[in-house]
Amino acid sequence: MADTDGTPDMAKGIKRPEDLPGLTLLQDEQTSFIKPPVNWAAWFKVAGVDVDPSDIPGPRFNQADHPVNAALSGAGVLMGRVSLTETALRDGRLVMPFDLSLTSGATYRIVCPEGAEKRPRIAAFIDWVTSEVAATKDLAAGRRFVA
């Protein structure tokens, strides 16, 4: 989860998960196909915050980068995918105010014809993707992941 209102200083006003209802919560509809769900309703449930899912305020986006851009513009609070927010998290434009994260169980795979993974250009691509994914792992250090 990441938060910004033009500056990470907004996170200083968010001390507990119970502080989030009533704020503008940016919603990524592209996660609706993921089971278990990775959305505000699921996050509030595991955080122990009693919120009616139909009462969760905020715009819904059907392109994954749109809620990220909205958060970066100060439009609300984002439950973001680390893969899409890594740079902004590292440079401080977005912050993770809580140690609780949802795990989706969704995975990405590289698929190629058998043996093609040994070709130099494909092997280099696989190595690059693997290193990029590994670089996001340290952002998860010390976080509680709940399915």
Residue ranges of predicted features:
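Short helix-loop capping/hinge motifs at secondary-structure junctions, enriched
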Residues: 6-16, 33-34, 115-120
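Secondary-structure junction motif
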Residues: 26-47
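Alpha-helical segments flanking ligand/cofactor-binding loops in enzyme cores
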Residues: 18, 68-69, 123
